[in-house]
Design a protein with these regions (language model features):
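Short periplasmic/luminal acceptor-recognition loop of GT-C membrane glycosyltransferases, typified by
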Residues: 33-38, 49-122, 151-160
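Aromatic/acidic, Gly/Pro-rich catalytic loop(s) in extracytoplasmic/lumenal soluble domains
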Residues: 148-196
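Short amphipathic alpha-helical segments and helix-helix/interface helices
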Residues: 85-88, 141-142, 168
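Short, flexible/disordered intra-domain loops and linkers
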Residues: 72, 124-133, 160-166
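Well-ordered, non-membrane alpha-helical segments in soluble/globular domains
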Residues: 77-84, 133-140, 163-164
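Residues at the C-termini of beta-strands that transition into short coil/loop
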Residues: 20-23, 116-119, 182
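Signature aromatic-anchored transmembrane alpha helix within multi-pass, membrane-resident enzymes
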Residues: 1-42
C-alpha cells in the first residue's frame, strides 16, 4: 500500500489504479483476519481458544482479557503466576525477573529490571555462551545488576523452560542462595557474599 501511495501519480491508467487499490484493500482485509482475528502469528494458533479463562483473576488490570496457553491447563498456569505475583509483591528488595510474562511489572506496579523480552535458548533471543556477543551481553547484565543494586533474581516460566543453570553464567563473581518455589516453574536466587 505504501509503495502504491508513493507511485500513484505515476500510474496513467485509471483501470490499473482502481485494480491496485481494490487489490490492496482485499489483501489488507485478508491479512487482518488471518493475523489479527485468527492470531496466526502467535504460539496460540493451534490452541483451543474455548479453554480460555478470564485473565481478570490475575489482576483487575487485566479486565476484559482472556487467558489461554499452549503449554498446560490455563488454570494451572494462572495459579503459578498468582503465587509468583504474591511472593514477588511482598519482597521489597531490588530484583530482576527473568520471564516471558512481561506484564507482571504492570500488575505489581514495580520495576522488575527485566533483562530481555523473552528467553528462548537456541533461538537467538539473547547471546548464549557460544555467541560472539556473549561477553558484551554478560557485561551489560552485570552493570545493570550493580547499577540497580539488585539483591535477588526471580525466574518464572513453564516447567524446566528457563533454568537457573542456563542463566547463572551471565553473572560474574556472584554467589547465590537458590530456592525452587514451584515445580521448576518459579524460583528465586538471592545474591549473597561469596565465601573465600
Amino acid at each position: 500500500a505504501s509503495i502504491l501511495h508513493l507511485n500513484i501519480s505515476k500510474i496513467k491508467s485509471k483501470y490499473i489504479l482502481v485494480f491496485l487499490i481494490i487489490a490492496v484493500y482485499f489483501v489488507t482485509i485478508k491479512f487482518h483476519y488471518r493475523y489479527n482475528v485468527d492470531r496466526k502469528f502467535l504460539d496460540i494458533e493451534s490452541v483451543n481458544k474455548k479453554n480460555a479463562i478470564n485473565a481478570e483473576i490475575l489482576s483487575p488490570k487485566m479486565k476484559h482479557l482472556k487467558w489461554v496457553t499452549p503449554y498446560t491447563d490455563p488454570n494451572e498456569e494462572i495459579e503459578v503466576i498468582k503465587k509468583a505475583i504474591q511472593i514477588i509483591g511482598l519482597d521489597k528488595r531490588k530484583k530482576v525477573l527473568i520471564t516471558h510474562y512481561q506484564f507482571l511489572s504492570v500488575i505489581l506496579n514495580e520495576d522488575l529490571n527485566l533483562l530481555n523480552r523473552w528467553y528462548l535458548w537456541g533461538n537467538d533471543t539473547h547471546p548464549t555462551e557460544t555467541h560472539k556477543y556473549f561477553n558484551f551481553y554478560k557485561k551489560m547484565v552485570n552493570e545493570n545488576i550493580k547499577r540497580n543494586e539488585i539483591e535477588v533474581i526471580y525466574i518464572l516460566s513453564q516447567e524446566n523452560e528457563i533454568l537457573f543453570k542456563h542463566v547463572k553464567n551471565y553473572f560474574t563473581a556472584k554467589c547465590f542462595n537458590s530456592k525452587n518455589i514451584f515445580d521448576n516453574k518459579f524460583s528465586y536466587h538471592e545474591i549473597i557474599s561469596c565465601k573465600k
